[in-house]
Regions:
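All-alpha RGS (Regulator of G-protein Signaling) helical domain and cognate RGS-like helical scaffolds
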Residues: 22-378
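Fungal secretory targeting signals
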Residues: 1-26
């Protein structure tokens, strides 16, 4: 066991210290269009499906589908397909960069192991899409089609990730893994909501399969955390989320107006909330946020609150402090009460209206106007 631990530490060090090769930065997709893949995904023939299953080290579920699907269950499956399609695009781009040793993605002795791991992950995500869309098709519902995605992982045009140390431009392997860990955390929280909604709407026949996906995503998350030299598990009860928060977060990676049928998903999209603070250590502190002045409309900042979601706790509501209007943005601060609640792992932040207390994540999302701001602390 001790030898294994030391070997793992040395392996991780080789990944984090690998120097850029100096090769030009490039991207698999210049216009954000990643599909179809070589195996025919997202609509593979039988041979393509077998290839995907071989790469995923397992098969699609072959049991009988449930007898019926509710309207809320349909929304669940569409959201799952939307998210998993993005993940396939993301990991396909990441595999391309590692395979071609794009600047920032030369992993030295860890190259082959990482490619083997990521190839398994991307094939597993493809099966998640096929399973969700297959269920929709079985119940004569419209399947979710791919969008175009902002997955140029070697480009500073990509989004930024707030971690417990700094804002990381996604321009290298470590930044990409940190981003993957954060959106996987959001998925793990959202699938809790999905399963509860299935159960409430007599779609319990889908809970077992989706829970197996929760386990798969959690295995991935532990791997991503290990690659960042973090503990494999962040907290005893993972942060919950809601479908609306996930639906909004996914669209940060989507080229606007590129989704053929995202409008068939009846979920709410919030206005953007930026986490401006670059360093967020594990302690009580004020965090700076911002949102666009044009999105504020007739809202009064005196009526706004910054609300946090962490673990399985009730939402934490904090008042705005130091509100400033600068340029086209509204800046404000709010207390991040880490010490009071041990806010490790993912915290979801949102600007809410109409209350200083919310019973649960659903009530918080109903009152949210801006969000989600995603914060990772370890």
């Amino acid at each position: 066991m001790r030898c294994t631990i030391f070997y793992s530490a040395a392996f991780i060090a080789s990944l984090t210290s690998a120097a850029p090769t100096g090769r030009r930065q490039s991207s698999l997709s210049q216009d954000g269009n990643y599909f179809p893949l070589a195996n025919g995904f997202p609509k593979p023939n039988r041979d393509g499906e077998i290839t995907i299953q071989d790469g995923a080290h397992g098969t699609l579920p072959n049991g009988p589908p449930p007898p019926a699907l509710s309207a809320e269950g349909t929304t669940n499956l569409k959201l799952i397909a939307l998210n998993e399609l993005f993940e396939v695009a993301f990991f396909t781009e990441l595999i391309y960069n590692i395979t071609n040793k794009v600047s920032g993605y030369d992993l030295g002795m860890g190259h082959d192991y990482m490619l083997d791991s990521l190839n398994a992950i991307v094939n597993q995500e493809e099966l998640h899409v096929l399973n969700a869309n297959g269920a929709l098709e079985h119940f004569n519902q419209e399947t979710i089609q791919p969008c175009k995605y902002n997955c140029k992982l070697s480009s500073l045009d990509f989004s930024q990730l707030v971690t417990d140390t700094l804002i990381v431009p996604v321009e290298d392997f470590q930044s990409a893994i940190a981003l993957a860990a954060t959106f996987t955390d959001v998925v793990l929280g959202t699938l809790q909501d999905v399963n509860q909604i299935f159960a409430k709407n007599q779609d319990d026949g889908l809970v077992r399969a989706v829970t197996s996906v929760v386990g798969n995503e959690a295995e991935q998350e532990g791997f991503f955390r290990l690659m960042q030299k973090k503990r494999p598990s962040s907290q005893p009860f993972l942060t919950t989320a809601t479908r609306d928060f996930a639906f909004t977060a996914i669209q940060d990676f989507i080229v606007p107006d590129s989704c053929p049928n995202i409008a068939t998903i009846p979920l709410k999209r919030f206005k953007p909330l930026a986490v401006e603070t670059k360093t967020i250590p594990a302690k009580n502190q004020n965090i700076k946020f911002s949102f666009a002045m044009k999105d504020a409309g007739m809202y009064d900042t005196n009526d706004m609150r910054l609300t946090y979601l962490n673990g399985q706790n009730q939402p934490i509501v904090e008042k705005f402090e130091n509100v400033k209007m600068e340029g086209e943005k509204v800046f404000f601060e709010a207390l991040f009460p880490y010490d009071d609640f041990l806010m490790n792992g993912l915290t979801i932040a949102a600007v809410t209206m109409g209350g200083d207390e919310f019973d649960d994540a659903d009530k918080m999302a109903e009152a949210a106007v801006f969000g989600p701001g995603l914060i990772e602390v370890d």
